Amino acid sequence: MATHQPLTEHYHQGLRDGDILTQIRTHYPDGPTLHQLAPLDQLHIGGIAASKKLLSLLDPQTHKHVLDIGSGVGGLMRQGAALGFHITGLDITHRFNVLNQALTDLSLHSTNPPLRCVTGDACALPFPEHDFDAVLFQHSLMNMPEPAHVLAQCRRVLRPGGKLVMHEVVSGENIADLRFPVPWAATPEHSHLLTIAELTKLLETNGFQLSHCEDWSSTALEWRQRQRQKEQTPHTAVLSPQWIFGERFLKMGKNLLENLANNAIKVVEISARC
């Protein structure tokens, strides 16, 4: 198995855990709403609207127990819990899980059913067979150097007929022009992007039947252009990705926009069944 130290170091470098909680308590003494937390905890391309669209692929009655792999600081989890899903989040970065729980505790929106945060490796999921009705990935598979192992583990923990849904960044036609740093990697050796063809083949090889694959790239580019304009205004936001990534995010955000515009990366939504 690959070592995860470079990944945790990448996410630890700019993380201001204590300052984040102080900022929230100061500006939102009654507790933040999901939308107020979104600039901090919805770190993926598309923000809270993209999470809403992804969750719409699941039904809380049919897919009651959900595993969010690479859950980060929990924006997707809290949004899903508000819809009635029982969500377990798994992340390799323990400080993210601690912050995730603290944000949930502070949140104005009651998470009923409660959320569960687990520190662990997606290549060796610490759950029994057939434990979940659905598995979510949102901008997390690209951090995983052994995606075949990860998808095999997903197949193991999903019940028969369970669903896997993804909102992922994949390689574009001009992947050789990919500029770093980006939010998921500071250097090329820590970026593990697949092409759409590679990803769908891996799903099929691991026993999944593809339901749909939708290219979100044009919408993602428009969203990132709007975010870039906001980031260049003198107004200081209460919360932003810089509380997670530090000053590096200014360069990361610029590169992300250029990578989308240059077709170095694409953004896709995928759903599959086992």
Name every feature range the model reports, one short phrase each.
Residues 123-134:
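A short acidic, Gly/Pro-enriched loop at the edge of an enzyme's catalytic core
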Residues 212-274:
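Conserved Class I S-adenosyl-L-methionine
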Residues 67-124:
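Class I SAM-dependent methyltransferase SAM/SAH-binding core
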Residues 1-24:
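N-terminal auxiliary segments of SAM/dcSAM-dependent transferases
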Residues 148-163:
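A short glycine-rich, Lys/Arg-flanked "PGG" loop and its adjoining helix->strand segment in the class I
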Residues 169-190:
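Short, glycine-/aromatic-enriched active-site segment of Class I SAM-dependent methyltransferases
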Residues 44-62:
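Conserved alpha-helix/loop element of class I SAM-dependent methyltransferases that forms part
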Residues 192-206:
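Short alpha-helix
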